[in-house]
Amino acid sequence: MEETRTFSTRDATNVHTSFRKAGNRMSAWAALLAAGLLEVGWALGLKYSDGLTRFWPTAATVIAIALSFGLMALALRSLPFGTAYAVWTGIGAVGSILVGMLLYSEPTDPFRIVCLALIVAGMVGLKLNSPV
């Protein structure tokens, strides 16, 4: 005889919890992406601050650093430390190099492009292998 099972409030709680956890993971990765982009911003701000001697670029740099660190801290609540840190610095490195190529005519030779692609591939691999 086939047993019928009813949907209980406990089942609803479990479904809600799993969706909330998925949302936290997505939020953590979004926070990490934003933190990495802000890292590019504060690195660029350092260039424009002229050795921290110009007020507004320096202020913008300090704000970007604080926001980047704050978002990284939020991401670390859910993501593994090593993965999060590697992705954060990778976004900053790749973004900074791309900004240098686009804004400051830094070299765009094929070897540099391959190296950037390897950094991105490493970050994607870490993300795909992350338990969260």
Which residues does each PLM region occupy?
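Polytopic alpha-helical membrane proteins, predominantly small-molecule transporters/carriers
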Residues: E2-V132
